[in-house]
Amino acid sequence: MDTFILTYSILFLALFIESIHSRYSRVAEHIRTRKRPDKELTEEEFKLVFHRSSTEEIDYDFVNLTTEITEIERKVLFTIDDKDYHLKLTRASSSVIPSGTLIRSAILWTDNQTHFHDEDSTDEHWGSSHIYEDLDKMATFLLRDDDDFTRYDGVFGGGKDMKVVGSLPARLVNIYGANYHFIYYANGSVSDVILNGAKQVVGSANTQAGLNNFYPKLLVLVDYTLFKILNKSYEETIRYLAIFWNAVDMKFKKFETPKINIIITGIIVPKNEGALKHVYDARIKSDMQKVNATKIITNSEHFFGANFSTESYFDNYDATFTMASLNDLEGQTGLAYIGAICKNNHNNAYVKDSGVFSGVLAAAHELGHLLASDHDEDVGCPGEINYNTRLTGTIMAEYRNNNVSKFIWS
């Protein structure tokens, strides 16, 4: 009897291993014989993965992610161009978008006024239980478990080496399996100016008091130009913001004192083009893809004026961040007053983002301004340093060196 059970068990195990081997052999053969994976995508699926039109050529890698799960971490292993990557992901202690974050849509009505409406509040799909990170590799991921597979969406690396990881649409999971992911570059930059009058609003009691812990509460507004890139999907937009702002938050985790943790207490997403009037009115009428970024900030003083809290029901925030996919006339990728957090009429920041996390560094830079940090060059610090024999950029440098792959606080 024991011999029969042992023989049956060995046979079952052999058949199981053979089925797994056969499955992966079919997938490998499928990849070899079919056209490029991105050419398998429909236009809708292409936009879901890359946040761009399928007419654009994307330089990407199609990679099989292997996951080893231990009690304390997820080890994610993959290879790109013969280089092995090892990420040690641990569950985030908190999410920048906590449960209960108020999400509202904005719409421009025929009365030329912006009106606000409740949308579904945040839920477990982008909470801390689904956010994993590797601080050493500057990696942050939103994980989604599907049967025996885990889908990874997020970013890793810094500077010119920052990459986006995108999971497969459901249809392609049935072809390739969910372990395969698209990986491509997220090219971002930083270029801003100190706003006129910024020196007069430097500092506040909170930023100068030597706190041990600081929790900047942000109201994030997604302009329609970015919302369109995110396929006009509220769920996709919130997932994107969860990854984006967790990536920004990670840059502040290098601070020992004070400890800085970002909390998003509100999100506004527009339903039509002109809903965020402070952005729309700053666009160049002869070329609506261009904008005067400085006007976004000056227009914000009126948009977030006396009636905003009453009409929108947003009043629990220290600063606003408006994200848009527009090209500034002077090439600025972000703007904020120095030391203006918690200061009405000046606590508004702008960041350019193209839907591929290109604005992460700029967002950290502008939040640094709000928290009273000057440009490094303005206070006698270099914008680049040799760190461990490697040329390294600083987050608060006025201009970014696009050849730098690592950024630190000076």
Swiss-Prot record:
Residues bound to Zn(2+): H365, H369, H375
Regulation: The gelatinase activity is inhibited by EDTA.
Recorded superkingdom: Eukaryota
UniProt-recorded Gene Ontology molecular function terms: metal ion binding; metalloendopeptidase activity; toxin activity
GO biological process: membrane protein ectodomain proteolysis
Coarse class of the protein's main subcellular location: secreted
UniProt domain Peptidase M12B: residue ranges: 214-410
Signal sequence annotation: 1-22
Subcellular location: Secreted
Tissues in which the protein is found: Expressed by the venom gland.
Residues annotated as catalytic: E366
UniProt KW keywords: Glycoprotein, Hydrolase, Metal-binding, Metalloprotease, Protease, Secreted, Signal, Toxin, Zinc, Zymogen
Function: The recombinant protein has gelatinase activity. In vivo, injection of this recombinant into fifth instar L.oleracea (host) larvae results in partial insect mortality associated with the molt to sixth instar, with surviving insects showing retarded development and growth.
Protein family: In the C-terminal section; belongs to the venom metalloproteinase (M12B) family.
Domain text: The N-terminal section (alone) shows no toxic effect when injected into the host. This section may function in stabilizing the catalytic part of the protein, or in directing it to specific target sites of action.
Protein name: Venom metalloproteinase 2
Organism field: Eulophus pennicornis
